[in-house]
Amino acid sequence: MKRRTFLLSGAAVTLALPALANTAPVLKVLKSPTCGCCTAWVDYVRQAGFTVEAEDVDQDELWALKDRLGVTPELSGCHTATIGEYFIEGHVPAPDIARLLSERPTARGLTVPGMPMSSPGMAGPGAGDTFDTLLIGLDGATSIFASHS
């Protein structure tokens, strides 16, 4: 009897996995159509397992989104994404996004300001830059969420 229950439980979980995958939040990215590093970052997060919807927009539309989200120029990157109730600004590493979604802190989102050369979508690991992923709180205050070298 125990073996039958175990096998039925395993089958139920296997059948449920596709439905669970479909409930994962979608990473919606707005980016410039001419930015190669933005496209490389989108490819990177897709390869990391995220479902991504990318849209090419002009700079006015991109900055309008950043303004609505409260992303200041000094905290901005070259592309902006949203996932669930959070924003993801710039070249944020996929493990940081996964951690954000797992821990669910009270915050607006994550940012990697600027375009650090060793960040995902840029020149790649070992390019020389160390960088921090910053958590932006509801009040706009930042704190280091993760450090990368």
Language model regions located:
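Thiol/selenol-based redox catalytic cores and closely related redox-interacting motifs
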Residues: 67-149
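Thiol-based oxidoreductase modules, predominantly thioredoxin-like and allied folds used
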Residues: 53-63, 83
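N-terminal export signals
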Residues: 5-22
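Conserved helix-turn-beta segment immediately C-terminal to the redox Cys motif
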Residues: 44-54
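Short active-site oxyanion
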Residues: 26-27, 51, 85-87
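Local sequence-structure signature of Cys/Sec-based thiol-disulfide redox active-site neighborhoods
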Residues: 25-40
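Stable alpha-helical elements in mature extracytoplasmic
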Residues: 41, 58-61, 93, 97
